[in-house]
């Protein structure tokens, strides 16, 4: 190949890469504006308040997160030893809990595989902490479509925790989760852009996550407004969207559950 032909080919490759990057950015900003169905309580069908883990309980029998409001309602009906959703008897120790998870893992349940990865990562349920095993499980769950697994992989690759640091790979997993409505992943993309000096793009990411009810994103936009990196109209829009999202997640049962636990 002549020098001229090689230069043309290289220019074409660069142009193709730039086009692919632009297309990805367009898809990234156009999708993931609504939280995934997995963030809804399977009983009342309302989105669970953020952070999800603090306002719901995972039931390993069916791998469904039930909001604290529906959990309270179940207790008020005398359901203390069975799952509010599938009515299976609840496990009472680590061994039986792990057995329930493993049973669903063996059937290829992406939520169970992701959940088991979490347990290995933190060394819970009597399991020895094993980050490598956690990453294996998260990778399998991500291939099956688990949004949570994409998020977890984004963190370990970006930080190099238990695996060789690979920030582009971490960002890739973060983008995949964000495009499916994962709030924390969307917020983290804003952090990445902020650290790269792309303040306008960072605010756009935080606008999306703030409108989904994520308070840290709203607070960050407020700080960006004070620093002159965000317009007053952007903060006002984010605040209105945040309030609407929070209001939609409220219910009398949930408020009662919070009152009883505080």
Regions found by a protein language model. Give the residues of each.
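Proximal pre-RING flanking segment of RING-type E3 ubiquitin ligases
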Residues: 2-54
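Short cysteine-rich clusters marking metal-coordination/redox-active sites
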Residues: 41-44, 58-59, 67, 83-86
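Cys/His-coordinated zinc-finger cores
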Residues: 61, 65-79
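Short helix-capping/linker turns of helical repeat alpha-solenoids
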Residues: 63, 106-113, 120-124, 138, ...
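Structural signature of tandem alpha-helical TPR/SEL1-like repeats
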Residues: 93-100, 127-137, 163-173, 196-205, ...
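TPR/TPR-like (Sel1-like) alpha-helical repeat modules
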Residues: 199-218, 222-251
């Amino acid at each position: 190949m002549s020098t001229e032909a090689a230069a043309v080919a290289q220019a074409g490759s660069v142009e193709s890469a730039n086009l692919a990057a632009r297309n990805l950015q367009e898809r990234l900003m156009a999708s993931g504006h609504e939280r995934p169905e997995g963030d809804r309580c399977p009983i009342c069908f309302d989105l669970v308040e953020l952070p999800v883990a603090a306002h719901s309980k995972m039931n390993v029998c069916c791998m469904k997160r039930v909001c604290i409001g529906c959990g309270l309602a179940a207790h008020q009906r005398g359901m203390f030893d069975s799952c509010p959703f599938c009515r299976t008897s609840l496990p009472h120790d680590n061994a039986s809990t792990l057995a329930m998870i493993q049973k669903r893992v063996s059937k290829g349940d992406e939520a169970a595989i992701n959940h088991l990865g979490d347990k290995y990562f933190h060394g819970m349920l009597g399991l020895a902490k094993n980050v490598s095993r956690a990453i294996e499980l998260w990778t399998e769950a991500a291939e099956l479509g688990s949004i949570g697994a994409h998020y977890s992989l984004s963190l370990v690759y970006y930080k190099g925790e238990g695996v060789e640091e690979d920030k582009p790979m971490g960002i890739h997993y973060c983008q995949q989760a964000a495009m499916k409505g994962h709030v924390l992943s969307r917020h983290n993309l804003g952090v990445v852009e902020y650290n790269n000096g792309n303040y306008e793009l960072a605010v756009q990411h935080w606008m999306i996550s703030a409108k989904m009810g994520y308070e840290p994103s709203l607070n960050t936009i407020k700080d960006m407004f004070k620093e002159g990196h965000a317009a007053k109209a952007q903060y006002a829009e984010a605040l209105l969207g945040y309030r609407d999202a929070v209001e939609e997640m409220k219910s009398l049962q949930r408020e009662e559950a919070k009152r009883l636990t505080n």
